[in-house]
Amino acid sequence: SSSRDFGSMLKFITRTKPHVFSEVIYHVQVSTLLDMGYLSKVNYYPMNPTGWNELNLKINTTGADYTDKSVQKEYERIDFYSYIVHIVQRLMNPKAGGKRKGILVFTRFLKEAERLTMSIPGCVIVSGDTPKKERERILEMFKVGEIPVVANVGVLTTGFDYPELDTVVMARPTMSLAMYYQIVGRCIRPHKDKEAAWFVDLCGNINRFGEVSDLHLKDTGNGKWAVFS
């Protein structure tokens, strides 16, 4: 992975205005938390679809991520929609590892999520347009196993507490280390009944950023901390 400064992830600590904190007095690396059992073991599965070409993705004007248009064009070119369905169906009936507790799919656009709900019985969409109470109802049903798959569009990267969750599918490319870290974080919470979570990446993100254990905090000088992968 490239050593790129993603210090904006820690902006709230030492770079806020007004200046509340001036220094970080203690830090712990993710790899240490994994070794100590405070985070769940994660098995990483990079599964790019045949023909996927990251060179076709264009960077937006801010340089922060890929343009919607280029991502949609690549999806259409390789029929990414059918591939997502194929992968999720395989995960629902794995050849090894036992039945998954729940499958949370992260998509970039509504179209992929709709394709999943059309093809997989019981799959439900959660998006920014889903009313709060309806979202809470869906997630509670997901947690107790009444909903096997949740396809979420641009939400649930933070604030979703479900330690038993053992399968996350990242069905969207990103240049944002913060987003990648947050998405992996949905399945990294430890639970006594979870031996290891599965993180299935369909868009080259593992190759881009590495495993979460590869992330490390570093003081880049003048109290400005950054995250590197």
Where are these regions (language model features)?
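Conserved nucleotide-binding/hydrolysis micro-motifs of P-loop NTPases
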Residues: S1-D5, T32-D35, N48-N53, K111, ...
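Post-DEXD/H (motif II) to motif III coupling segment of the RecA-like Helicase ATP-binding lobe
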Residues: S1-Y44
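Short glycine-/polar-rich loops that comprise or flank the Walker A/P-loop
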Residues: F21-E23, L39-N43, P121-G122, P163-T167, ...
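SF2 helicase motor core recognition
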Residues: G37, V149-V169, V184-K192
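Cys/His-rich short segments
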Residues: T67, D219-S229
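Conserved strand-helix element at the start of the C-terminal RecA-like helicase core
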Residues: S70-C123
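Conserved helicase ATPase core of P-loop NTP-dependent helicases/translocases
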Residues: L104-F106, E112-T158
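Conserved segment of the helicase C-terminal RecA-like domain
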Residues: P173, A178-Q182, R186-L217
